[in-house]
Amino acid sequence: MASPVEASPGCASGLGPHRRKRTTFSVGQLVELERVFAARPYPDISTREHLAQVTHLPEAKIQVWFQNRRAKRIKDRKPGALNSRLELPPNSCSLPDTPQLPWDPGTSSHPLHPTSSAQYTSACPPQTSCLGPILGPGQSWSGAKVAAPWGTSGASGIHSSLEQIVPQTSLGNLSDLIYTSAIVTNVDHF
């Protein structure tokens, strides 16, 4: 009788390639990573360790995320790069200019929960639908208010989650959206 390892081809027996499990980042983790990346594309070890505590990710995964994000930025900046997402939806709303990040990592004891969702404060009237435009590199909204996923004090008209704005079909598209729409503030604490 064959053992379970022998019976399953490619599983630890050397018969096939071993595929590493792909890391799936939560919206909250991506918001935090993108925010720091916008200020420091080459974070030092203390910044990466702080991000590891805040996002509940291993420091090594954070380091790899930054390497991949820098490569993506270089790829997106190449002339002639195909970018079909430059058009704004006709009924999309503009977001206010003032960033709102109520969380201060230097004073707060509320870490980012890995399953949190980012929330955006919208300037749209409550009865209308805000379609989040997907913009290419070099384009931006008139501004964006980002409420930290772990607190929404002082925010009004908040979408219940980022999933209402952007479908969760591709981490690449979500990462592009966060990168192009996030406003960097309060990064001097690093």
Swiss-Prot record:
Residues 106-123 have a biased composition (Polar residues). SUPFAM superfamilies: Homeodomain-like (SSF46689). It holds the Pfam family Homeodomain. Expressed in brain, skin, ovary and liver. Also expressed in maturing oocytes, eggs, zygotes and 2-cell embryos, but not 4-cell embryos. Its main location: nucleus. The keyword Nucleus applies. GO terms for biological process: embryo development ending in birth or egg hatching; oogenesis. GO terms for molecular function: DNA binding. Keywords: Developmental protein, Differentiation, DNA-binding, Homeobox, Nucleus, Transcription, Transcription regulation. It is found in: Nucleus. Residues 1-20, 76-123 are annotated as: Disordered. Transmembrane segments: none annotated. It comes from the Eukaryota. GO terms for cellular component: nucleus. Probable transcription factor involved in the control of specification of mesoderm and endoderm. PANTHER family: HOMEOBOX PROTEIN SEBOX (PTHR47777:SF1). Belongs to the paired homeobox family. This is Homeobox protein SEBOX. It comes from Mus musculus. The gene is Sebox.
